[in-house]
Structure formats: structure tokens, C-alpha cells
Amino acid sequence: SMIIARGVDLISAGIYSNYMLIVNGLNNITNQVFNGIVASFGNLMSTSTREKAYENFKVLYFFNYLIYSFFSISFFVICVPFMKLWMGNDSLFPIATVSLITLYFYIGGMRQAVNLVRTSAGIYQPDQYFPLIETAINLGLALILVKPLGINGVLVANLVSMFLVPFWTQPYIIHKNVFDTGVKNYYLRYCVYAAVALFSLLLTQFICSHLPAMG
């Protein structure tokens, strides 16, 4: 918000904060769900084989996808009419910005299962410097892109830094150190889940756009 306020204007920063208020609220709900699973998964890893733990991780990963695809689709479809009702027409972002916010929420949320395993296994050492690298990339790109692209530039910086660092490093670390297996299957599932989520979003948006207006 500080970069947006300095690089764009205070009004846009305020509108952005309203959108992120919804996103953070959804994240708080999902965090409560996954935080409740940490101890159980940690106990599972200590009492079962790596193969059994990996099979349970795949179930958890699918559960992760179900939650975040549902919330992402709901946010994208409902966000504009909700913000129009709540804040008025002057507080709406264009569809491109809403799409970037939705993508940021989805990609960040799809890390929940990986983060849960890392926390349960207590694996922090291999990952200790990557957050600093991600932050440096994010900040540098945001400062470069905010002038030509505005808020979209800040969101693109968030997505690029997330994609360049934790998208690759965190899954690799847990698959190598916890499950002792390759990471290829993880990314294949990720692509399939993303494709299904995108199709579901487009279908939902199409259906909602053809519903008769209320009132």
C-alpha cells in the first residue's frame, strides 16, 4: 500500500486496501483450518512411513486446491458487485486488476499444504534465505513497475517474486527432505488443478452473467 500511495495516489491505495481486506479475511479463515491440521500431520509423519505420509500429503494438497479454488472463484465473481454495493462505483478496480488480485490469492493459497508439511517437519534451515530474496525481487520490481503500470505493476511484482522463489524452492525442499521423492508429480497436479480451476471460473462467470438481474 505504501508503494501504491507513493507511486499512484492515496485514493487507489485506499481502494486496494478494501480489496485486500476481503482477501485477508479469506486467508484468515483458511489459516485456521490448516493450523488445526499441523499437529495431526506432524504426528502422522513421526508414526508412519514416508510413503504413507506422502499419500496423505497428496490428499491434503487436493483439499488445499478445493478450498482455494472455491474461494478464488467466489472472490472473482462476487467481488465487483459486492464492492459496488459496499463502496460505490467510484471504488471499483478494472477487471484486469481484480484478475491479478485473484491470481495472487490463489497462487499464494496453494502453498498452504507445502507450508503445513514444512512446519510439521520443522524444516526451516534450507529455506532461511529465500524469503529475503523473494522480498528483494518483489520490492525492486514493484518500484520499477508501479509508475508505468500503477497498481497492476505492484501486483505483477508480487506474482513474479512468488513464482521465481517459493513456487519452486518450497515444494522441492519438502519433497527432498521429507518425502525423499521427486517434485515432478507435484507440478503436474498443480497444472491440472489450475486448468480445472480456470475452467470452473469461466463457467461460473458465464452462468452468473446470464442470470436475470435482481430488482
Predicted segments with their positions:
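Helix-loop junctions and terminal segments of transmembrane helices
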Residues: 19, 23-61, 65-68, 115-120
